[in-house]
């Protein structure tokens, strides 16, 4: 009789040490500036193994032991253009020492106080993220001990958002925020539907390339009543469409694409 073997053996230990510093200065009633940096030291020890089929021996899919760093810095200014117009603009950058990848991300927002009760705002920004550490240390049969994903670039996204806020009363606010997000340089498996945007397993076992895309379109609506006479509540709803393009060039629904979400909160 065949002896049973485990289907997977996932050993993963991670420790992050974070150093953050910020500097704020108010130059005038209409001009303030904020700058800062964050240094994140990441220590990892991973050995992820799976069996392709039942009763087969485990095969290593990701293995790494060491440390790396993510360094980020930003500078942001808020300028009161007039009594009704406010401009927020800045730049953010980050650098991953693991593979010497870096990104520069401009961000800006413009707010208009149309009336004492109504505000409109428009915001745009570029954002990026690194992947989970196990992704960078994937090993395949054809490459032996070589980490096939170590040179993956950041996943990047462009965010555009409109905002309308209305003060219904001293204790109640309404906010409506339509938005769109365009993602690019998303790690995907070549000629496959797989994308890290749709990751569901505890591990990744294939070589990836930064050729995927994603798109999120939606609108968030929030009604909030502030605490008064011991009662507080908030009702929020979202309508959205979330899709990604795999390495095969085909667009799919993400696993998060439920199209709507409704939440309620009440407290006394």
Labelled PLM ranges:
Residues 35-37, 89, 108, 122, ...:
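Membrane-embedded beta-strand positions of outer-membrane beta-barrel proteins
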Residues 180-182, 203-268:
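Gram-negative outer-membrane beta-barrel transporters
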